[in-house]
């Protein structure tokens, strides 16, 4: 999901090299503007205080749309669906997906950074362990990171407290499918092993992505996302399509009707915003004026 240095957002003047996370969307039949805010799951909540126009965007919108409705995701029945999707088939164990040497390497890393024995995860899909390991790495290496404080959740909570509608661009089922079912188990296993054998690189990339986000530099964030090391650990085009680009296109199809209904604050991961196939460009191609907000 993160990979080749390329200059982006020099595509047109309206989406020029701006260091912004908040964007205004107007025109194309909208009576009042909507806004798009990019988030980052490793960033502290304090980033919102550095975006001076954010309160204006909050005040001028009547609903918040995120990737998911976070309250829905936390319902017991949906938590159960996610837990089930994380489990390996009955005839497969985690250990069976690796050589003994590979398994031992991963076990040592999991013990070091997560403080648990890998044997406890023997029925979990590798993708689920990779996600948990990434959180553990972030907690050890990123100052101020608190997995219990997420920007996406904060925006939805504020909207609910103000009596505004909260909506989601995707279903829980779709996100679960992307996370745990879009890759073969052998590919998930390889990516877990890649993470375990490239811990320093993983931490460095997370740090640089978070620094780029805190600088509100979408250009740099995209460049880091597209970096490649030219081996099997690199994200494939198909994986990027599943994780980023197909979702961008789907959101861009939904948003005209949503924004027409009411002025909307759209809150999605910042990695979805920049580039030729980014959400900002897709909205602009539909005839909207897309402007950075200070």
Positions of predicted regions on the chain:
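Positively charged n-region of N-terminal signal peptides that target proteins for export
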Residues: 1-4
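Structured, acidic catalytic/metal-binding patches in enzyme active sites
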Residues: 21, 27-34, 40-235, 239
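Hydrophobic alpha-helical segments, principally membrane-spanning helices and signal/leader peptides
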Residues: 23-24, 254
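N-terminal signal peptide c-region/cleavage motif recognized by signal peptidases
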Residues: 14-16
């Amino acid at each position: 999901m993160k990979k080749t240095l390329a200059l982006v957002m020099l595509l047109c003047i309206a989406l020029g090299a701006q260091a912004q996370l908040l964007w205004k969307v107007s025109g194309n039949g909208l009576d009042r503007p909507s806004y798009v805010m990019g988030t980052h799951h490793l960033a502290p909540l304090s980033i919102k205080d550095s975006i001076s126009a954010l309160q204006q965007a909050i005040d001028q919108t009547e609903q918040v749309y995120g990737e998911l409705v976070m309250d829905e995701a936390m319902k017991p029945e949906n938590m159960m669906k996610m837990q089930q999707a994380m489990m390996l088939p009955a005839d497969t164990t985690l250990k069976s997906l690796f050589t003994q040497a590979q398994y031992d390497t991963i076990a040592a890393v999991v013990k070091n950074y997560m403080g648990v024995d890998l044997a406890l995860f023997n029925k979990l899909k590798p993708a689920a362990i990779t996600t948990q390991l990434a959180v553990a790495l972030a907690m050890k290496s990123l100052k101020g990171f608190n997995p219990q404080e997420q920007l996406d959740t904060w925006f939805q909570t504020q909207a609910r407290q103000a009596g505004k509608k909260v909506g989601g661009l995707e279903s829980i089922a779709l996100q679960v499918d992307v996370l745990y079912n879009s890759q073969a188990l052998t590919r998930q296993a390889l990516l877990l092993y890649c993470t375990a054998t490239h811990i320093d690189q993983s931490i460095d990339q997370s740090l640089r992505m978070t620094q780029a986000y805190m600088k509100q530099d979408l250009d740099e964030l995209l460049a880091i996302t597209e970096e490649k090391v030219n081996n099997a650990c690199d994200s494939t085009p198909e994986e990027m399509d599943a994780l980023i680009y197909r979702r961008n296109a789907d959101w861009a199809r939904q948003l005209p009707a949503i924004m027409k209904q009411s002025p909307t604050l759209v809150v999605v991961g910042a990695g979805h915003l920049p580039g030729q196939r980014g959400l900002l460009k897709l909205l602009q191609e539909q005839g909207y004026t897309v402007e950075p907000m200070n």
